[in-house]
């Protein structure tokens, strides 16, 4: 996807071999998973040294990288030295309760505590900052190490009190005058007050992580919040629900600006809803949002205060004669992500990953079929509501690969560079490669000067490549790619698995 002429002459990079790195919260055989422990959001920070997860119980858990601290340098620096390159290692840092269950008495509506999204903000003065949201309320958190203060001893030794001249300790006045002056109100012992002993507070070298909520952004969404995204200006962010996108300033919690509103005058005329929204990683005036009809709109906030019109519309024309009852349901986009340079947008609908060039709105430059073999079972998936599952997607920092999840705790990794045939299936377990399949791409067809590629998966209906039946109760919805390395974090129920290549 990136690399220009050099990549074209050297060919696509070789396929990666993925290895297990770590697991947090691993389940034992037969252990029942509590609903509140299921992970619902994952996000790396920009440096890749911190990872945050949110769960359905409203908690945010932070992890920090440890392998770079051992040698005091980044992984890139270590690769240029004689140190053996170790795989990325993270450790538990802290956790805090971000959201609590609430009840909206005006609408008689329960608001669950589940964390929908987490986004990291710019760190400052050694403190970490992040945004977390549930269905209705966004919170801005500051996480900082603070030194623990302890009471060590009293300030004056009792034995020293006898050496203090009595005339100097009576209310700051000479003993004789002070006693006479206050004798009407107070009674002092003869000779004045003995020395006052106060505890001495000493700052120890021990530190404690403290999470403090700095802002609460509430009462701005009538519908469930599905997305939050930081602007590259470091000062603003957007939040999106089914019908609106709002713009916030991080420092102002009681005011937001509605920049996108797709709510019709008559709700009976509603044909699509907003499913995901994301700021451009470089240009703070541009953002994209996806819809339940499978389209992506790129808007420029400089055009007008309310962005009713889009700068570009990305949608794939429907193939003639292919429409069915499920066509519109599976076309709904569940997640979009910009590439690091902002040139491409990756989208995930129920069956496919699609890669879009923002300079070409005629169609995606590549499509990756995630679980095409489930198409004959769409009726079953509709009946058990699995067809409405919202899978996330992610891109590698170099833009050469894309990834997304599937059922049976499987996830797919595809090569995104021109000519690549990489298409791996991995399992969220300690042996990720045991179900791997490598399937060559179909012949690509040209669109103008670009190339559209379609990569297919296993074709056996309702089964995995090794013949096992798909388990629709175990699904890998949430995953994140490290910003600078080939390292993936993914959530399988309450377990966080990490892999590297």
Swiss-Prot record:
PROSITE patterns: PR55_1 (PS01024), PR55_2 (PS01025), WD_REPEATS_1 (PS00678)
Record bears the keyword Glycoprotein: no
UniProt entry keywords in alphabetical sequence: Acetylation, Repeat, WD repeat
GO terms under biological process: protein dephosphorylation
One GO cellular component term noted in the UniProt record for this chain: nucleus
Positions with biased composition (Polar residues): 439-449
Subunit structure, as described in the record: PP2A consists of a common heteromeric enzyme, composed of a catalytic subunit (subunits C), a constant regulatory subunit (subunit A), and a variety of regulatory subunits such as subunits B (the R2/B/PR55/B55, R3/B''/PR72/PR130/PR59 and R5/B'/B56 families). Interacts with SIC/RON3.
Similarity annotation: Belongs to the phosphatase 2A regulatory subunit B family.
Listed name of the protein: Serine/threonine protein phosphatase 2A 55 kDa regulatory subunit B beta isoform
Originating organism: Arabidopsis thaliana
Lineage: Eukaryota, Viridiplantae, Streptophyta, Embryophyta, Tracheophyta
């Amino acid at each position: 996807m990136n690399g220009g002429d050099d990549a074209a002459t050297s060919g696509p990079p070789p396929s990666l071999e993925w290895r297990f790195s770590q697991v947090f919260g691993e389940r034992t055989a037969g252990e029942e998973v509590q609903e509140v422990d299921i992970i619902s959001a994952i996000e790396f920070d920009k440096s890749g040294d911190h990872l945050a997860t949110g769960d359905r119980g409203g908690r945010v858990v932070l992890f920090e990288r440890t392998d770079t601290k051992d040698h005091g340098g980044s992984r890139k620096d270590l690769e240029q030295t004689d140190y053996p390159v170790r795989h990325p290692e993270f450790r538990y840092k802290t956790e805090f309760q971000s959201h609590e269950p609430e009840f909206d008495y005006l609408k008689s509506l329960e608001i669950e505590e589940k964390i929908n999204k987490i986004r990291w903000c710019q760190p400052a003065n050694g403190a970490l900052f992040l945004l977390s949201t549930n269905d209705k309320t966004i919170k801005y958190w500051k996480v900082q190490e603070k030194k623990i203060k302890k009471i060590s001893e009293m300030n004056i030794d009792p034995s020293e009190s006898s050496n203090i001249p009595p005339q100097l300790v009576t209310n700051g006045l000479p003993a004789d005058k002070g006693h006479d002056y206050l004798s009407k109100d107070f009674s002092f012992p003869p000779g004045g007050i003995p020395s006052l002993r106060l505890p001495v507070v000493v700052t120890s070298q021990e530190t404690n992580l403290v999470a403090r909520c700095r802002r609460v952004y509430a009462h701005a969404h009538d519908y469930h919040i599905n997305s939050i995204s930081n602007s590259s200006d470091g000062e603003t962010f957007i939040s999106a629900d089914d019908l609106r996108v709002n713009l916030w300033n991080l420092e102002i919690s009681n005011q937001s600006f509605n920049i996108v509103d797709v709510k019709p005058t008559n709700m009976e005329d509603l044909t699509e809803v907003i499913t995901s929204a994301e700021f451009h990683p470089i240009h703070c005036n541009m953002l994209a949002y996806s819809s339940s009809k499978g389209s992506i709109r790129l808007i420029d906030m400089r055009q007008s205060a309310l962005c009713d019109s889009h700068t570009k519309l990305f949608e794939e024309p429907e193939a003639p004669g292919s429409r069915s009852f499920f066509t519109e349901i599976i076309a709904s986009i569940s997640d979009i992500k910009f590439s690091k340079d902002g040139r491409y947008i990756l989208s995930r609908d129920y069956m496919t990953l699609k890669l879009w060039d923002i300079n070409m709105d005629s169609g995606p430059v590549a499509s990756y079929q995630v679980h095409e073999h489930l198409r004959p079972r769409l009726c079953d998936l509709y009946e058990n509501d699995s067809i409405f599952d919202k899978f996330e997607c992610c891109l590698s920092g170099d833009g050469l690969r894309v990834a997304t999840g599937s059922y049976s705790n499987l996830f797919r990794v595809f090569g995104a560079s021109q000519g690549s045939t990489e298409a791996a299936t991995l399992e969220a377990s300690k042996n990720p490669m045991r179900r791997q399949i490598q399937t060559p791409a179909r012949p690509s067809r040209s669109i103008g000067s670009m190339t559209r590629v379609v990569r297919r998966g296993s074709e056996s209906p309702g089964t995995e490549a090794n013949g096992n039946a798909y388990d629709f109760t175990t699904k890998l919805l949430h995953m994140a790619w490290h910003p600078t390395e080939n390292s993936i974090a993914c959530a399988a129920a309450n377990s966080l698995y990490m892999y590297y290549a």
